[in-house]
C-alpha cells in the first residue's frame, strides 16, 4: 500500500498514557502486536483499560471470575474503551488454613498489588477494573489502584450461597466448627461428612460477613465500588450486571480523569471503619485498611478503630456472630441499607466522594435503599435500638500489646478474663492441645511466632478457634496471638498483638503460668510482669528466620508491623 493509501485511524486523546504504545509510526511494532490479538483501529484509538482477573480453580471464591471478567470486558468494549484482560494470583485461605501453606495468604496480598502495578505500568494502561474473589484479592487490588493512582473501579466476584444440611442452612464456618465438635464427641464423623458435602453448593466467596464480604462491603464505603455492587451472589445474574456496569464506569472515570487520589480521604476511611464495626466485620479489615491508608499517604492510626467503634453501634447480625449471610443482606437491599442507616444517624461523612464522582450521600439518595424500620427483619436493627451499643471491633493495649491488638466482639460485650497462660510457639502445638481435649473453661492460650516477620505471613488461626468453639468454649476460653484470625472466627480471640514475638515484643517474654488480664471494656491486654522482668527474660532474644530462601524468606525481611498494616511497599507512608 502506498503512503497515500495508508489507512487513517480515528484520533486518540493525546493525554492518555497509552498513546506511548499506540501512536506514531515508531509504534508500528507495538500496534502489530495488538492486532495479533484482534484489536482494530477503533480499539487502538480508545482508552486502554485493564481488567485484572485472579481467576483460578484453587478456590470457589475465584472459580467463576473468568465469566465476571468477561462481563466487565464487554462493558468496557461497548462503551468505547479498549479492554485488556490479564491475570494475577490468588491463595485459597480456607484450603490452606491450618497448614504451613497459610503463611502464603498475606504475602499474596502484596504480590497481587505488585503484579497489578507492574502490568499497568509496563503496558502503559489508562485505567483499570480490579476484580476480587478470595480474601486477600480485595486489599491487594485496592492497594494497586491507590499505588498507581489510575482511574479505577473495584469489582467483587460475589459470595457463595449457603448450603443446606439437616433442615438448616450451613456454611464453611459450620464445617470448621464441626471438626471441634467431632473431637469433643458432640458430632460423629459421618455427620461431619454429610455437612461437608452440602456446605458449599457452588461458586463464590465464603458467605458470612467474613473477610471477603467485609472487604467487599468496605469497597462501597470507601468509594472504590458503586453502591449495591458488593452483595449480589456469585452465581446470580445481577452479579454479571454489576460487572458490566463496572466496565462502563471504568471508561467514564478514565475520560473524566477521576483517580483514587481524587476521592480517597481520611473521611472515606472513617466511613469504611463505621461500616465495618456496624456489620460485625472481620478483624482482618483493620490490617487491610491500615495498609490501604498507608498506600494513600493518609494518616490512620489503629486507635481510630476504637474511637469509631465507640460511637457506632452494631446493627447487623450476620455470621460469624449471627446466623445470616450476605445473600440475606442482598435480598433486602444490600450494603446501602446499612450505609443509609448510618448516614441518617449522622454516623457517616455523607460528603465523602466516590468513584462515580458523586458523594456517598448523593449516591444513597439516587439508590434510595429501604430503611431498617421499613424492612422489619430480625438480622438488622436500627441505630436507635442496636444489637450492641458499640461497634464490633476493639483495639486492646497494655504491657503485652503496647502497639495494639485486635478483637471482634460477636457475643457478650462485657468480657473480662484473668488467668494463667499456656504458651505455644506455633499454631500446630495449640491445635494438637485443643484437639486432644485438654482445653477447659477459663483457659488462656497464647500462640506466638506467627507475626508478619516471625511466621512469616501472619497465619490465620481459624482451625484452632473453630475447634475451641466446636467444643463449646467460644466465650469462656481466651486465645491471643501475634498472628491473625479468619473473618469466620468468633469468640474470645485476640490477634495482631504488636510488637510481635520475632522482633522482641513483650509476647516473646511469656512463660507458662504467667497471669494474663484481658478486659474488653478497659481495652487491656496485660501480664503480671514488670518491665524489668520482661527485659530480663528477653535478654539474648535473637531468633533465626524460619526460612532462609525463597519467597517466604524475602517477605520475612520486607514486612512491617501489624500495627501499620504489615505493608511491604517502602513508599507507603504512615505516621
UniProtKB/Swiss-Prot annotation:
Cofactor note: Binds 1 [2Fe-2S] cluster per subunit. This cluster acts as a Lewis acid cofactor.
Pathway: Amino-acid biosynthesis; L-isoleucine biosynthesis; L-isoleucine from 2-oxobutanoate: step 3/4; Amino-acid biosynthesis; L-valine biosynthesis; L-valine from pyruvate: step 3/4
Record region (Disordered): 1-27
Keyword list, A-Z: 2Fe-2S, Amino-acid biosynthesis, Branched-chain amino acid biosynthesis, Iron, Iron-sulfur, Lyase, Magnesium, Metal-binding
SUPFAM superfamilies referenced in this protein's UniProt entry, alphabetically: IlvD/EDD N-terminal domain-like, LeuD/IlvD-like
Keyword flag Oxidoreductase: no
EC number(s) reported in the record: 4.2.1.9
Binding site residues for Mg(2+): 93, 135-136, 460
InterPro entries per UniProt: DHAD_IlvD/Edd (IPR050165), Dihydro-acid_dehy_C (IPR042096), DihydroxyA_deHydtase (IPR004404), DiOHA_6PGluconate_deHydtase_CS (IPR020558), ILV_EDD_C (IPR056740), ILV_EDD_N (IPR000581), IlvD/EDD_N (IPR037237)
Cofactor: [2Fe-2S] cluster; Mg(2+)
Pfam families in the cross-refs: ILV_EDD_C (PF24877), ILVD_EDD_N (PF00920)
GO molecular function: 2 iron, 2 sulfur cluster binding; dihydroxy-acid dehydratase activity; magnesium ion binding
BP terms from Gene Ontology: isoleucine biosynthetic process; L-valine biosynthetic process
N6-carboxylysine modified-residue sites: 136
Coiled coil stretches, renumbered: none
Residues engaged in binding [2Fe-2S] cluster: 61, 134, 206
Catalytic activity: (2R)-2,3-dihydroxy-3-methylbutanoate = 3-methyl-2-oxobutanoate + H2O; (2R,3R)-2,3-dihydroxy-3-methylpentanoate = (S)-3-methyl-2-oxopentanoate + H2O
Top-level EC class as recorded in UniProt: lyase
Active-site residues per Swiss-Prot or TrEMBL entry: 486 (proton acceptor)
Family the entry assigns: Belongs to the IlvD/Edd family.
Subunit structure: Homodimer.
Function: Functions in the biosynthesis of branched-chain amino acids. Catalyzes the dehydration of (2R,3R)-2,3-dihydroxy-3-methylpentanoate (2,3-dihydroxy-3-methylvalerate) into 2-oxo-3-methylpentanoate (2-oxo-3-methylvalerate) and of (2R)-2,3-dihydroxy-3-methylbutanoate (2,3-dihydroxyisovalerate) into 2-oxo-3-methylbutanoate (2-oxoisovalerate), the penultimate precursor to L-isoleucine and L-valine, respectively.
Identification of the protein by name: Dihydroxy-acid dehydratase
Taxonomic lineage: Archaea, Methanobacteriati, Methanobacteriota, Stenosarchaea group, Halobacteria
The encoding gene: ilvD
